[in-house]
Curated annotation (Swiss-Prot):
Regulation: Pantothenate uptake is not reduced in osmotically shocked cells or by ATP depletion with arsenate, but is reduced greater than 90% by the dissipation of the membrane electrochemical gradient with 2,4-dinitrophenol.
Biological source species: Escherichia coli (strain K12)
Location of the protein in the cell: Cell inner membrane
Descriptive protein name: Sodium/pantothenate symporter
Family as reported in the entry's similarity comment: Belongs to the sodium:solute symporter (SSF) (TC 2.A.21) family.
Keyword list, A-Z: Cell inner membrane, Cell membrane, Ion transport, Membrane, Sodium, Sodium transport, Symport, Transmembrane, Transmembrane helix, Transport
Biological process according to GO: pantothenate transmembrane transport; sodium ion export across plasma membrane
Function: Catalyzes the sodium-dependent uptake of extracellular pantothenate.
Gene: panF
Catalyzed reactions per annotation: (R)-pantothenate(in) + Na(+)(in) = (R)-pantothenate(out) + Na(+)(out)
Cross-referenced InterPro entries: Na/Glc_symporter_sf, Na/pantothenate_symporter, Na/solute_symporter, Na/solute_symporter_CS, Sodium:Solute_Symporter
Amino acid sequence: MQLEVILPLVAYLVVVFGISVYAMRKRSTGTFLNEYFLGSRSMGGIVLAMTLTATYISASSFIGGPGAAYKYGLGWVLLAMIQLPAVWLSLGILGKKFAILARRYNAVTLNDMLFARYQSRLLVWLASLSLLVAFVGAMTVQFIGGARLLETAAGIPYETGLLIFGISIALYTAFGGFRASVLNDTMQGLVMLIGTVVLLIGVVHAAGGLSNAVQTLQTIDPQLVTPQGADDILSPAFMTSFWVLVCFGVIGLPHTAVRCISYKDSKAVHRGIIIGTIVVAILMFGMHLAGALGRAVIPDLTVPDLVIPTLMVKVLPPFAAGIFLAAPMAAIMSTINAQLLQSSATIIKDLYLNIRPDQMQNETRLKRMSAVITLVLGALLLLAAWKPPEMIIWLNLLAFGGLEAVFLWPLVLGLYWERANAKGALSAMIVGGVLYAVLATLNIQYLGFHPIVPSLLLSLLAFLVGNRFGTSVPQATVLTTDK
């Protein structure tokens, strides 16, 4: 183990836990459900931008994405920039209207919004189960990414790193709640920005300059410097699919959408769009370019996902590597705590309180349950991540696609189409979810498109057809989402 690398990382984790303790003390000033799961809807513009960005940018962006850029070349860097409008789309399409309705319905979770809009318990149960299944896959990816970071950069065995990482994040999420999550996201977003810039400078310097790095890539494989990438992977169908999956479809991600109901005011959302888009641009471009150019520095990696932690050790002094190891670690931790919190909220608010509405005011029991459920989920994820695949980006995209196929149209059409009803939403969820699962499992790509494209198209069609057999739901006027 490398002590110079580990010490700064330990200091970073101490700061994370310190923020969680602060959030736990602050929590006593608000009602439990609103404070624990939404931070009492008090986010300003900078915090909103950072938490949305940090939640969106995960192990896939800091580990898997640069790993793919290492394998496929500069074309993948171009592909990654497709994600640039993600924050603008999320806050622009969901943002203001979502927040207004959430306050009207006193919604704490995404499923609260769906129930208030469609008045269907079956829809809420289906949405809850879909969310939990997909989040298990998505969070497993993050745990694998965190353990690989510690393994490569700090010399800690994979299993030991997995335990350190998993236990740390489960504890601070369980006891700090949403406020700890977003405050840590803000700090972690700044760490990511600084770490990305410093690492990219180090990689370019180690490669002998930008021009020399590109020439080296061309020598290794001329396709590494073409827009199509190695193996001509970046076809028009692939790029369209990728845009739908990681940009447009982000509107349907529950842990992203819930950020849109927890900000303070209109000024916060406008500032969040601008700052968030700038941060996404810097992080996406910087990390993927570092991954692509990293092949000129270390051309013989057998596991592409190890490129960023390996580069950190190679191009930075040990102590600096320890400091900036916190950057990808921050990306991973911020995504997991958002997804863990959303999973806990789903189990408690959407499932447990649905069965036991009499427990709504029992805050002592709810606090205890929230912490225990988060810790149990963390333990299950440790088991799931014990034997990792070679490249995590595909598993992450699989989980993202499943969430988008289920949630996208019920969310968007529920907000903007007054005649949308429960039968239409249920039809879209079932068709989208089942079709995506079948196509992804059997690896069927119609006309070269990723399964998310036909799944969303047929899900939309199913919504329109199913909607004809239902009746319009009057807008809820009661300020409650008790199911």
